[in-house]
Amino acid sequence: RSTPKPSSAASDVYKRQVLTKLQSDIDFSSDTFPYMGVRSGVISNIPARVIRVGFVGEIGYEIHVPQLLGEALWDLVLEAGHEFGIQPFGIESQRILRLEKGHIIIGQDTDAMSNPNEIQMEWAVSRDKPFFVGGRTISELERKPPLRKLVGFLIDDLNSPMPQESHLVLDGTKMTGRVTSCNYSPTLKKIIGLAYVPLEKADSGSTIVIKSSDDRSVEATVTELPFYDPKSLRQEL
């Protein structure tokens, strides 16, 4: 049985400097600790497992420690980051940042019928394994084009009603898709979101119509993902 472990995420341009200030036997340099790497060691005498992640679109580290030591580590990180202006951020900020980066949330941007091809995550399926659960189904689905795609969309008109999760994408009076995520992007100064649309509307530049809560029709433009930092330069600082 594993010990319950709280996690803390450090995600700004100074996070490597902050963690380096803490006494640790983990080398946080980019060359030895690449993106999506995992390291185990000690941080300020606290045993820790560290994962280099980028869910919010910046270089970041997720730190897992024994539950009783979580608050102590939190205090140490805030103290080490004080000179850099470190500030905690909450779930709402995280949700906006991950949306700007086009990262999906399983169960929100996916459903029981979703497959890797529909959500543009074919890269996440390893082809090196001789067998894995769901492999045969995925192979069968790849034999024909998908009926829908999860795409990004932009709304330039900030006076438009902001679509909400599960608002419908319409073609005339016909329901052709639905919104899975939507929010205002302070970085882009636009309304951005994710939605399932039919394949013929999945190309960048296509116009889709979303039905809002007040029964108004909102036009949105399909765009390439991610919305922010498409070359992921911010994750390699």
Task: State what each model feature region is.
Residues 1-14:
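Single conserved hydrophobic/aromatic residue that forms the stacking wall/gate
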Residues 5, 72, 163-164:
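Residues that form or flank phosphate/diphosphate-binding pockets in enzymes
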Residues 8, 50-53, 173, 189:
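Compositionally biased, low-complexity repeat tracts
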Residues 11-142:
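Glycine-rich, acidic
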Residues 114-237:
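Glycine-rich, small/acidic residue-mixed loop/short-helix segments
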